[in-house]
Amino acid sequence: MATNGSASSAQLSQKEADVRMMCAAEVHLGTKNCNYQMERYVFKRRNDGIYIFNLGKTWEKLQMAARVIVAIENPQDIIVQSARPYGQRAVLKFAQYTGANAIAGRHTPGTFTNQMQTSFSEPRLLILTDPRTDHQPIKEGALGNIPIIAFCDTDSPMRFVDIGIPANNKGKHSIGCLFWLLARMVLQMRGTIAAGQKWDVMVDLFFYREPEETKPEDEDEAGPQAEYGALPAPEYGMVGGDQWTTAQIPDAAWPGEGQAPISAAPAAASWSDSAAAPADGGWEAAAPPSGAPAAGWE
């Protein structure tokens, strides 16, 4: 009797710790709309209209989903998928620790129904992040009689979903916390982790990371860049050394200021005068026209 009591108390303490973690990750926050099939999992409604989940029922549904996952002999027959960006990292981490296959990103239509595709697969279980964003794999899984486990919010459609886990499936912390708890429960049921032993993997590894967080690290690895003012000035005299020179041009090489200006050619007496004085500077006068000048306008 004492052994059973200690085991139940340890399980209760673990459940309390998991509920506190889910509460810190805002798993209990729903939306302002509630589907009639999700009303049984709602604890209350706040004054601002947000529905609050009963995290005790969420923990029980996680246990049920973990039992279904463990019942499948080959983990490669399980596909965990997320089209939502906040769940893609959590999906990859869950597949890494449980041995399942992960599809992070957009679902290619026909993956579960079209045998002509190279990416065709027939999984025995499908785990999804959001039934609304992952509606295409739900439809294909229903056509192929594939059991579906999904994290469902208060406004999520429950059609073709076999096991709906009531939780917040829109927050980056809540999605990571849910997949971390599900992965730990699966490993505990498989015997990889002892029942009372703490899992070494931190829940932070399942959280979504912003792309800007890795940018300063790349800059530090590249090394400090030289400032613009610290760069050496280019030596213009070295460009084209065969043709250019840096020596100063003497003043004698420039034309003098006292040089006589070029005089203009004298104007002809009339338009008919063909013999005009040549212009100075070697310019020759233009040849006169061959025909006789016209006397007037005709």
Swiss-Prot record:
Where found, per UniProt? Cytoplasm
Record keywords: Acetylation, Cytoplasm, Ribonucleoprotein, Ribosomal protein
Which terms does the record give in the GO molecular function aspect? mRNA binding; structural constituent of ribosome
Q: Which residues carry this modification: N-acetylalanine?
A: 2
Q: Which SUPFAM superfamilies does this one have?
A: Ribosomal protein S2 (SSF52313)
Q: Name one GO biological process term.
A: translation
Q: Which is a Gene Ontology cellular component entry for this protein?
A: plasmodesma
Which portions of the sequence form the region Disordered? 252-298
User: What coarse category fits the chief subcellular location reported for this protein?
Assistant: cytoplasm
Return the Low complexity bias intervals: 263-298
Q: Which InterPro entries match?
A: Ribosomal_uS2, Ribosomal_uS2_CS, Ribosomal_uS2_euk, Ribosomal_uS2_euk/arc, Ribosomal_uS2_flav_dom_sf
Biological role: Required for the assembly and/or stability of the 40S ribosomal subunit. Required for the processing of the 20S rRNA-precursor to mature 18S rRNA in a late step of the maturation of 40S ribosomal subunits.
Q: How does it assemble?
A: Component of the small ribosomal subunit. Mature ribosomes consist of a small (40S) and a large (60S) subunit. The 40S subunit contains about 33 different proteins and 1 molecule of RNA (18S). The 60S subunit contains about 49 different proteins and 3 molecules of RNA (25S, 5.8S and 5S). Interacts with ribosomal protein S21.
Similarity-based family: Belongs to the universal ribosomal protein uS2 family.
PANTHER family associated with the record:
40S RIBOSOMAL PROTEIN SA (PTHR11489)
Protein name per the record: Small ribosomal subunit protein uS2z
The source organism is: Arabidopsis thaliana (Mouse-ear cress)
